[in-house]
Amino acid sequence: MKNIIVICFFVLIQSGILVQAQTNTTTDIYQQGQDGYACFRIPAIVQSKAGTLLAFAEARKKSCSDTGNIDLVVKRSEDGGKTWSHAITVWDDGDNVCGNPSPIVDQETGRIILICCWNLGEDHEKQIIDKTSKDSRRVYVLYSDNDGKSWSTPKEITSS
């Protein structure tokens, strides 16, 4: 029995089945205070048809609050997440909220579709839910046909 275990061990070594332990590494894609933003929240990540990682986030300009000037940004990685591009602005609507990024990749065409929300920057969540806000929360769609390097103009689809 002892000989069988020793033989199996050497067979495994020779076949390459025994591998060294993998070292896990982490990378902070978005950091507080980076690129002129106070805070980044609500991340979403997808892999494009070309293999590029796209990390979306809400970029909160003045604070980590859910109201005020919130932009949608994306960072790209073409090396499996080892390095990341600077933030690319997907949608900036001044002092309003552009948020809740929900990316989808069309595996046939390669188009990256981004569903997101918009509301007035001065409207608070409770007001929106209670229907006492100045405006409502709306749903928009944007897309990229060049692997997330640039984005279409947002199109409202709330009633669709």
Residue positions per predicted region:
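Positively charged n-region of N-terminal signal peptides that target proteins for export
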Residues: 1-4
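Sec/Tat signal peptide C-region and signal peptidase I cleavage site
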Residues: 17-21
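Asp-box/BNR beta-propeller blade signature and adjacent active/binding-site loops
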Residues: 22-160
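Bacterial N-terminal signal peptides
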Residues: 6-16
